[in-house]
Amino acid sequence: MLELIVCRACLGCACSFSFAGLGMIAQRIFSPAGFAIAIGLGDSALGIGGVIGEFGVDYFGERLGWREIMLATALIGVPLAIGCAWSLRSKLFAQIQSTKEHDTIPATLTMTRQIQSVLKKREVILAVLIYGGTCGMIMGFGGFWNIPLQEAWGWSPHESVILNSVFFIGTAIGAPIAGILSARIGAKKLLIVGVVISILSYIFDLMFPPQWIMTNVADWPLWVDCVTMFIIGFGLGTSILAFPIATRVVAPEMVGLTISIVNFSGIFFAAILQVAPGVIIQGFQDTTLIALQVGHSVFVLGMLMALAATLCLPSHTQTAHI
């Protein structure tokens, strides 16, 4: 058990480093608007990976053991990651020199002081809350709790996997679109629209089961719930705008740290939102539909936190044009 925990922790660290590295490279190559698109494409890849993982485990789970599946993914992922890193130009990994516009050279500060200087920015704090509520929903709901909820509605395990995969497809499509539109519409407006439609769609899926809505129809079509899942994921795709919101107010040499802080918030809240529903459900005598509904209410609270933080953003919050 200890070995498994250590391996999972190392895997999580590797993923965190890779996302921060992606942000740093994108910030050096692209304009602010291009940075938003690049982060959106990176998050889109995460959504596509979620879809592949869902279908892969569903298909190979009955044919192979979990060890074999993990080994196969490692054999594919490790050389792929090494090849991607090797193909990048070395200057993209060079240290960013601070500009003379700043009184204090961040390189001379301790890590604690650097974190404090970043967290003094109001937009960074708001971005942390935005990404915490939205990424926590994506990882907590899509990463675990969606399938038990769909099975409680009466869908088969295979149909529940399809619904969860459609949720990740929505995030994969919504993230790059949010990055593209942020230069024209503005990050704040996009976030408000995205989070609101996700909240409303999620409440609809949570509170109104097919048996209640269509009491006179024996077969509730799967595609209707697929549309709902897609809308939820699509709206949450705007979560990537938290990164350009946070990084545009810090010095270039602080971008990597800022991305790491925002990303930490998303993973931290994801961990909380994976545990919290289970703690609530344990208060019930059995895992009934009502227990799952009550447990899933924490995801609504997370998205409401993100919405409240978005509303507190300055009205001029907008990514620069490409």
PLM region spans:
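Helix-loop-helix hairpin linking two adjacent transmembrane segments in secondary transporters
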Residues: 42-93
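Juxtamembrane intracellular "pre-TM" segments in multi-pass secondary transporters
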Residues: 94-126
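Helix-to-loop junctions at the C-terminal end of transmembrane segments
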Residues: 174-186
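C-terminal ends and interior cores of transmembrane alpha-helices
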Residues: 197-218
